[in-house]
């Protein structure tokens, strides 16, 4: 008899400056194994999508989408679209025994989603989701997952709430769910924001507002159906009849809507900061380093292009004539440097005019 998963739990992960996230993740998986997911008749799959150290801010929404895509690809035969539930789960919320049963309760209406709200949660719940949200598969797919374009902390949960409402999915809130908060020293919103600001991890308010505006218009085209990623490594860390845990290191490749990475300076900037006419002049500068071309360079880099082009052409001309420029034209001896060639010319009759 083929196994049918009761839960697919999606956990987004990125180590931070405190180096505490890994221990939180280990604690969470152990709690899943010992307390929450112990029934062999209701097996759970946990997929942890770990964003690589790519120099960019954490993208929680895209990591959640990737975790689901990997689950569908690797465990498609075990996912029942009518019965399996999809859980979006932060790594710093460890469920207590009294909360375990709540994961397996279906929304009372379909399509529907249930938000497990932690007692004493530091965040206001209106207009957004908390750290643990349970969907039926139909509802999750109807929202098109999370937006892919929120690079940094904050905003993606507000966007996901708006998607859920726009998709006609009913939201049920389950108050006072019992979790242990694994993130220490940030008992208030102010402390949390202060820590994020110290590491420049937050999305700026102006940028967040613009992303929310764009997502309200484009959510059907940016989400599960617009994913680009590369799996760097994959490891099964738990394999029991009741629980399977897979950790994947992934390179996130989906860019945010309305933004593009400049080929010259590699900054992620709004499209309004770019000149499309510059593609012809800069494509050759980046094509050896980048495999995809969005056809835009920012205005600042466009201003610098004439000097950059001239400099690059001089370098290429020198490289093309390097062998000739290191060879004595009289005796055909080749030297390792121009200085060595000049010393040779000074010490011999080579190069003397008759």
Outline where the language-model segments fall.
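C-terminal recognition-helix end and immediately following basic linker
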Residues: 281, 313-327, 338-354
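Conserved donor-nucleotide/metal-binding helix-loop-beta segment in metal-dependent transferases, i.e.
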Residues: 96-122
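C-terminal catalytic/acceptor-binding lobe
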Residues: 28, 152, 158-257
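Short, acidic, metal-binding catalytic loop of nucleotide-sugar glycosyltransferases
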Residues: 2, 16, 24-42
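A recurrent flexible, glycine/aromatic-enriched loop bordering the glycosyltransferase active site
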Residues: 117-135, 142, 152
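N-terminal C2H2 zinc-finger "knuckle"
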Residues: 263, 325-336
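Short beta-strand-to-loop acidic/aromatic patch adjacent to the donor-nucleotide binding site
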Residues: 76-96
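Active-site-proximal specificity loops/subdomain of glycosyltransferases
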Residues: 22, 26, 39-83
């Amino acid at each position: 008899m083929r196994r049918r998963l009761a839960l697919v739990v999606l956990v987004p992960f990125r180590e931070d400056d405190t180096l505490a996230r890994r221990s939180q993740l280990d604690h969470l998986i152990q709690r899943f194994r010992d307390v929450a997911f112990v029934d062999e008749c209701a097996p759970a799959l946990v997929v942890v999508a770990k964003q690589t150290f790519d120099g960019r801010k954490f993208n929680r929404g895209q990591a959640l989408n990737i975790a689901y895509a990997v689950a569908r690809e690797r465990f498609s035969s075990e996912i029942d679209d009518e019965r399996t539930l999809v859980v979006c789960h932060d790594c710093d919320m460890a469920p207590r025994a009294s909360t375990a049963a709540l994961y397996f309760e279906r929304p009372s209406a379909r399509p529907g989603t249930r938000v497990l709200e932690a007692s004493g949660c530091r965040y206001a719940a209106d207009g957004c989701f908390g750290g643990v949200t349970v969907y039926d598969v139909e509802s999750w797919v109807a929202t098109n997952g999370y937006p892919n374009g929120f690079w940094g902390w904050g905003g993606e949960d507000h966007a996901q709430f708006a998607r859920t409402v726009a998709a006609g999915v009913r939201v049920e809130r389950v108050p006072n769910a019992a979790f242990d908060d694994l993130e220490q020293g940030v008992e208030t919103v102010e402390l949390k924001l202060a820590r994020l600001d110290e590491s420049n991890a937050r999305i700026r308010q102006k940028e967040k507002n613009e992303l929310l505006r764009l997502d309200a218009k484009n959510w059907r085209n940016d989400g599960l159906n617009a994913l680009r990623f590369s799996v760097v490594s994959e490891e099964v860390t738990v394999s029991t009849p009741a629980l399977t845990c897979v950790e994947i290191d992934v390179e996130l490749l989906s860019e945010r809507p309305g933004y593009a990475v400049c080929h010259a300076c590699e900054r992620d900037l709004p499209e309004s900061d770019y000149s499309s006419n510059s593609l012809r002049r800069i494509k050759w500068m980046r094509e050896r380093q980048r495999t995809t071309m969005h056809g835009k360079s920012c205005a600042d880099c466009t201003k610098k292009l004439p000097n950059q082009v001239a400099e690059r052409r001089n370098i290429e001309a020198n490289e093309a004539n390097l062998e000739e420029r290191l060879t004595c034209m009289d005796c055909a001896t080749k030297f390792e440097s121009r200085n060595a060639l000049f010393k040779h010319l000074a010490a011999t009759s080579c190069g003397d005019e008759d």
